[in-house]
């Protein structure tokens, strides 16, 4: 069984039962616009929150149990979100483009070899001028527990061609393991 599918048999540490504060603040500031794709959406808290604010939202995740839980939440809350089981590296299987793509903890799961494939496919599902907002673990997070840490330089290198990095700023990745959250980077990246 896949690591993530197995994790969703219980409540994984990153599933906090509400949207990540960073995405709530982005939405409140008006930074998230139009149709939204949530890559690696898990049980859908960020997607459901944005749909509740009036966005048309699609959420994709490779873990069937996560998508099943997201669909149950949408039904219980009476919120319309299209949740799909998809390999997030194969975004080219989605036949539409989005104004905004959000990523709450997906990028930091990618290997160095997977990153170019993801970014190439991401480019195909986001409109020119569209925004990609990524929340990932920072190299400033101490210890070895949890996902891979990502440096600012890795983000800059990965999005060097065809993208403009608006900012990479210190943020918090909320989780159930550490009440203070984990040190993270929040990046705003525009497709050229």
Per-region residue spans from a language model:
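Class I (Rossmann-like) S-adenosyl-L-methionine-dependent methyltransferase catalytic domain
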Residues: 1-37, 43-96, 110-125, 130-192
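Conserved acidic residues
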Residues: 99
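A conserved beta-strand element that flanks and buttresses the S-adenosyl-L-methionine
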Residues: 102
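Short catalytic micro-motifs in class I SAM-dependent methyltransferases
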Residues: 105-109
